[in-house]
Amino acid sequence: MYILGIESSCDETAAAIVEDGKHLISNVISTSVKEQALYGGVVPEIASRRHAEYISATVQQALQDANMSIADVDAVAVTFAPGLIGAVLVGVNFAKGLAYGAGKPLVPVHHLRGHIAANYLTHPQLEPPFLCLVASGGPSHIVQVEDWCKYHVLGRTVDDAAGEAFDKVARTLGLPYPGGPSVSQAAKTGDPHYYKLPTPHVEGKYNVSFSGLKTAVVNEVHNAQQRGEEVRVADMAASFQERIAQILAKKLLAAAADTNAKTLCLAGGVAANGRLRQLVNDGAQKLGAKVYLPELKYCGDNGAMIAAQGYYEFKDGNIADLTLNGLPTLAIDYR
């Protein structure tokens, strides 16, 4: 079964074709990230306009790369939540028109479910149940994936997202957008123990908070500038990355130990962070658990992950009609 996946929840306009939820046929991404970088982050209006400009050609290119036409596709899957609402609506409305015109089923896909499904593309042998840390520009979650379309949230971000914290710290340190790769690159030559950053405390054993950590970095930099001192950018980047990776890994591994989970996954943009991957791998080895990590190309937003999850949503009977609307927020375990 061939699924066309369409993604437009943030600043990537993406389309892909995936067979049976696990086998990539084509994958095309058009991004406005360079334009967004001029403003130090995503400007929703710019993102929406670029989606409207790029989406038709992006979908056409995905079909062309697969040597297919829309008639060869079995269903059209699209991100409908969560995300920047203007951006989401571009993808949803395009997918509705395409599916209706071609007489194909329309499959709504939750963006974070898509991130989890990116693991199926890298590891076709992976099957639920497993425990997954989803960390991205949106809320982080520790999720028990009980079945292909059944989820139980154990922990979540209570304030700022991990990706958002990376972007804010990058701006504070004068590093370019997007913040995740910039901070990681700067951290390579830094001392992760130079700055003593706090570990935020939060209610809920598996919940995470990054607002205080982000503020601590901003204050440290501001105070140094007020004193006329040089900010050690590489050391601050390394110290921040170490703290955020330690927090996320510790929560995931604690949940794994408490639930006796023997299969762990990472998903989302922050899953590309090398230090986080290392900490999770090391901790899982001590627990006797196996870790599955998505390829770096699947960590950011892409259409392939939406097509992959779209296959399982379709098999589960999650078919939408033309009343489908985009949503800015929606729990991953919605039903």
How would you describe each model-predicted region?
Residues S69, Q185-L264, N273-L287, F314-G317, ...:
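A contiguous, well-structured pocket-lining segment that forms one wall/lid of small-molecule binding clefts
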Residues I70-F80, N260-V270, Y292-E295:
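Short glycine-rich phosphate-binding loop at a beta-alpha junction
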Residues Y2, S8-S9, A16, S26, ...:
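A short helix-loop
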